[in-house]
Amino acid sequence: MTELLKLSAAELGAAIASGETSAVEATQAYLDRIAEVDGQIHAFLHVAADKALEQARAVDARRAAGEKLGPLAGVPVAHKDVFTTKDMPTTAASKILEGWQSPYDATVTERLRDAGLVILGKTNLDEFAMGSSTENSAYGPTRNPWDTDRVPGGSSGGSSAAVAAFEAPLATGTDTGGSIRQPAAVCGLVGAKPTYGTSSRYGLIAFASSLDTPGPIARNVLDAALLHEAFSGHDPRDSTSVNEPVPPVVEAARRADVSGMRIGVVKELSGEGYQPGVMQRFTEAVELFESLGAKIVEVSCPSFTAALAAYYLIAPSECSSNLARFDAMRYGLRVGDDGTRSADEVMALTRAQGFGPEVKRRIILGTYALSSGYYDAYYGSAQKVRTLIKRDFEAAFQQADVLVSPTTPTTAFRLGERIDDPMAMYLADLCTIPTNLAGNAALSVPCGLAPEDNMPVGLHIMAPTLADDRAYQAGAAVEAALRDKWGGDLLSQCAYAV
């Protein structure tokens, strides 16, 4: 069974389709792996073993009936616990939703089921996707499989840890300020933020509606592309959904060629203040692009220096509005409802006990930024910076086909190291936030281990809106070249590799 864990998602899907193995065998192999190691990693909040095997049997029955299966039919997937699932709990890693089960599936969930993927369960995250370390979960932190004393990044840390520990070949995540790319980078994985509006938010528990983007986490670029295509596309139930063809990311991942491509190195997203080992691996990756026939150009995006400040006004402002729905009246936790208290008192008690410290911090910050007398000075100014960032991206993409930077300024930090220092925590998303504010596409691919701590470093590849395929094409090219250089995948060096 261990041999099945070593297969890529594409290879596993092909093996199931050909009858070389079965969906049940693949699912059981991953369920056994979860039982073996998740006590140490804590990637999952809920494992749906019986339901997963039931889904797997249905895929095998379809094949036995002669039906042609899709490329990921029967392949297990771990699902971030912010996507609603009608047959298992959805908590957003918050006490306020403990035990709650949605009456409907999110579009991402629905499309994965339709594509025949087997949902193993729901993964841990920072509460309501607010955080960069998965330490803000009400159900305890997830640990990085490369070093269990370190964080797996966040907020999609459970999904990244599950894939890195070979508890799942694929996982879903959400990216609001870097919450897919950052954990993928520090866990030695591939993670993508699709163009905003190309992957549906219907059934996604909202953090910041103008920023939240579902995306894939995988062990290689092709696997990420296959998952990306499986759940993307227009959805009339999401008012922000883009009615455009899904960028051909699978085709681009298979092309894996950067000859003649213009690669723009963003001046403002590297250099001073970055961990030396991160900069070393990033510089080597840029040189590798050049050796593969790409043209390297330096680009400047001055507004990016204000991106972090703008994001931490815009995102909390939207969160303060979105989380108002958790009012102790309709669903979720209800505290103090003994008949002696008013509805307002019950609501206040419920929120006080149901929301964690980081969520409360962001609600307060957002409410202040939107308050009378401060709206223009804070939220209004942040939106103006957002416009400048979009313009800087547009200008940069006149000079380059894709832009690159490190994915994170440092490798994974130690558990507890930044939990009491919000500003230090927020800096983990320094390189990824501009892409969310602009809405364009980005991909993180592993580019080596930092010499100081032997922890993974991510290469961040940014592409224009609806040109996700460019990022995948460049990412696949550098991935193939590095695989040749290393003599295999970087993940084979992980402490939890099989």
UniProtKB/Swiss-Prot annotation:
Swiss-Prot/TrEMBL keywords: ATP-binding, Ligase, Nucleotide-binding, Protein biosynthesis
Name of protein: Glutamyl-tRNA(Gln) amidotransferase subunit A
SUPFAM superfamilies, A to Z: Amidase signature (AS) enzymes
Disordered as annotated region, ranges: 132-159
Gene Ontology process terms (BP): translation
Active-site residues per Swiss-Prot or TrEMBL entry: 80, 155, 179
EC number annotated for this UniProt entry: 6.3.5.7
PANTHER family: GLUTAMYL-TRNA(GLN) AMIDOTRANSFERASE SUBUNIT A (PTHR11895:SF151), TRANSAMIDASE (PTHR11895)
Recorded catalytic activity of this chain's protein: L-glutamyl-tRNA(Gln) + L-glutamine + ATP + H2O = L-glutaminyl-tRNA(Gln) + L-glutamate + ADP + phosphate + H(+)
Entry's Gene Ontology cellular component terms: glutamyl-tRNA(Gln) amidotransferase complex
Family as reported in the entry's similarity comment: Belongs to the amidase family. GatA subfamily.
GO molecular function: ATP binding; glutaminyl-tRNA synthase (glutamine-hydrolyzing) activity
Enzyme class: ligase
Function statement: Allows the formation of correctly charged Gln-tRNA(Gln) through the transamidation of misacylated Glu-tRNA(Gln) in organisms which lack glutaminyl-tRNA synthetase. The reaction takes place in the presence of glutamine and ATP through an activated gamma-phospho-Glu-tRNA(Gln).
